[in-house]
Structure formats: C-alpha cells, structure tokens
Amino acid sequence: MEFDSIINGDFVASAERSQNINPSDLSDVVGLFARADRAVTNQAIEAAAEAFPSWSATTPQLRHDILKRASDLILQRVDTLGRALSREEGKTLAEGMGEATRAGQVFAFFAGECLRAGGEQLPSTRPGVGVTITREALGVVGLITPWNFPIAIPAWKIAPALAWGNTVVLKPAEIAPHSAWLLVQILAEAGLPKGVLNLVLGKGSVVGEALVEHPKVAAISFTGSVNTGRRIAQGCTAALPMKKVQLEMGGKNPLVVLDDADLDLAVEAALNGAFYSTGQRCTASSRLIVTKGIHDAFVARLSERMQALVVGHALDAKTQIGPVVDQNQFEIDLGYIARGTDEGARLIGGEVVKAETEGYFLRPALFTEADNAMAIAREEIFGPVACVIAVDDFESAMEVANDTDFGLSSGICTTSLKYAEAFKRRSGAGMAMVNLPTAGVDYHVPFGGRKGSSYGSREQGTYARDFYSAVKTAYTLA
C-alpha cells in the first residue's frame, strides 16, 4: 500500500518512496511512503501559513471540541493504533497499545488547556495606566519527531501547538511514519480545518532543512539526536527571521542503587528502565551505579531476570522484548557490545536471537566491571544495553551520576529519606525518580532535561505553553 504526504487536506505524491519494514518480520512491508522534496515541503508550509489567520482566530471552545473529538477517536481505536505501531516500530503489543492510549490522553489534556488560556491584568507603576498580559499563537510551527515513540511524541507536540492557535507542518521519522499518518487522518476526521495540520513524509536532511530555512516557519520543535539538534538550533538562529527552537536530544541516564535499597524493587526498576521498549528510550537507565555492599546480589538477580525475558515478535502476546527498530540501529547496538568487551567490561547476554521470522532480535546486554570513562558509559547507545558501575558510597555515586554530558532523567533506589531528598536536590538531570524506573513520565507534567539533553522550553503539561505561544504586554491609558 502507498502512503502520500497530506497537505491542505489532499494527498500529495512524490516521485520517490521508501519502504516501511516490520522489524519483527523483514518480509512484511508495512507500506511504501512518499519521500517528499523541498518543493512539497514548501507547499505544506504555504498551506499552513494560509490557514493560520482563521485558525488562530477561532474560539477556545472550537479548538477544545476538535481536540477532544480527536482524543475520543484515538481511545476508541487503541487496539488498531497499538497494533499498527508495534508492527512498524517493534514495541511489544502491550507497549504499543499503551503508547496509543497516551496519545489520546495528551489530546484530552490539551483540549482542556484551550479553555484555560488565561492572562493577567496589572496596574502600572504610572497612575492611570493599566497593563494586560496575554499569550498569542506563533504562526506556522515545524514539528520533527523520532521513530521510538511514533504516535505519542507527535501527539504531545501537535496538541499544544493546535491548542494555542498555531498551524503545523509535521515531519515524522522516515523509518516509522505510519502511526503519524494515522494520527493526522484522525484529526481530519475530528473536524480540524484543511491546512491547519500538514504531514510531510521524507528525509530529515531534505524536509527538516526546508522547515528550518523557510521564512514563514516561526518555530521548530525537534526530538532526536544531539548532532541533528545542534544543526537545527544553528539553522534557526541563522535564519531570517530567527526561529524559536525547542530540542529534546537524548540521555545517558543513571540509576543509583544504594546498599539499603529494596533489592527486588531495585532490580525491577533497572530491568524496566534499561531494557523495556528494547532500550530505545531517551530516558532509559543505561548506567546502573551500584554501591559495593549490594553490588553482587544486584548483578546476580538482574542477570537472572533479564536472561529470562522473552525476546521475539512484537505482536506475539508472550513477547516481553521486541526487536531493534532497523538494520542500522541493530548494527550500532552490536558495535557497542563489541566495544564494551574490548574496553574490558564483562558481558552478560547480548546474543543475537533467532526467531520463527527474520527480524532484528537481540537479547538484552549487561556489562559489569565497567567504569564511567568507557564509551558504553559515555555515549547514548539507544538499545537494550546497560552497564553496571560499582561505587563506594552515596557521595561517589552522585559524582559518577552527574559526570555526563547529558542530563535528562535520573533515579535512585534507597529506603533512606535523607538520601532520597539529597538525590532529588543534587541530581544534574531535569527529572529525578526515587524507587522508580528512570523511564516513565506522566503526560500532565513537564518533560525535559539539562546539558546536552534538552534546549529551550519544557514539553508537556501546562509548561508547553511557554514554547507554543508568545507573551504580549499591552498598556492602556485610562
């Protein structure tokens, strides 16, 4: 089946197409997806620009109703959307359905935000003068989304953009575009006017670059790699006029396990954070920093649990770990496994798994005897690969945890209130978890990090308004 870009409510074909392959079964082609060029991208931007004046002038009630209908439709189709997501990206079916549910919840939340826009009215320091502070839409917003959450991340960017009256050009990841395509179709069914949301399928180096350079695009929100994010930021500041930019770029997240931790709880937090979703989460626990008193018991228990995980076809109900997303990521993961061994760490697991279908199946890999200077502890792998770093005590654990170029998520397992509070205060990450996996954030709270992980305003929750709206201060002489 062929899938085209969607511009101004119409399907727009491209001369080139890319195959979307099921990573659980390489013989299963999900579809042939358009590979748009710069001209098609510019067409989408012009459609969004033309739709902006009328959409930004709509009432909060109208925007609420459309977003709420979209939420209802998504939640009614969780089974279908979850299965489509798992088929193209490789998440287990339970994870795929959970992500589709999250997308519906996000739209419901931002439907409510349409009615909570608010503002301020203040007296001036000058007599007889009033001050009104309001928020306004930016204009055309370019959204560039990754493959690892192919419906949730488009949802948490699209929903606030529309709630605040912006129009959108969405460019989903080329290797997992089907979920975004289905989401755009649902929004049209919910009554979103033509041109307000436009979907451009294609390569980031073509579509993304056109979005960054076009003068009618007011802002870019990007989730992806650090290197690409930096190029986008440079392009947005070099463009005329300059663009507002928001970047989410990954992590190398620590989970600290102290001697006083509940061992079973700590192991389950590490197992979930490091290996679920095949480790393909920017919030994954890729560095397990463990004090020496509990180290051996923790490693033994975690090794036992991880090697018992069922690796297989994403749509098989028995599967706990699905395939790696594609050949390129599969080779990256195997390369880091070889590199960790070469660096002197001891490998547990990490074998290629043969299944009934040909796919990118990899057993979770755990490195012990690692140190924080190794590449496997410094660089984001984005696969089911984690390392254990032994430390003496809480102070040395904090030093290692914060010794990273990233700062997205962090966690600690402890029964000590003293250490839990100290960790939350001293963690160099934007999110800190106590006795929980580092992966897993509610949809109504801010998401984002520090250092090389994030740049610009936070995503999600009420904090999303800071990116998707502009503040205006108006004075009136009475």
Predicted regions: what they are:
Residues 119-265, 391:
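Rossmann-like NAD(P) dinucleotide-binding subdomain of oxidoreductase/dehydrogenase enzymes
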